[in-house]
Amino acid sequence: MTTNISREPTIQATTFLELIYSDICGPIAPQTRGGNRYIATFIDSATKWAEISLLKTKNEVFSEFKVFLKREQTQSGKTLKRLYSDHGTEYKDSEFEDYLKKRGIIHTYSAPYTHQ
């Protein structure tokens, strides 16, 4: 017996900043003129609004996430409820996790070896 597996995310949102998907692509070659080798993505589940940030290292995702979050919350008047990412060590950093917990943001991880 075979079963079709849905490629649709299991978690869906209905309002802006209810759920943000984040992932890192790279390393890209050649690197940018500024020395960036990675791309961080931030995608809103409800609106499909997407933003990217260029990174020199994967560890820069936390600082870029903070910039993204502050800007989007200020502009929309809404607060982020949930962040969905893979199990990359850059997302499991204790400083990143503490930041999310202090703001009441739930961090959900994808199953290993699955596409965001």
Task: Identify the meaning behind each predicted range.
Residues 1-116:
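Anionic group-binding determinants
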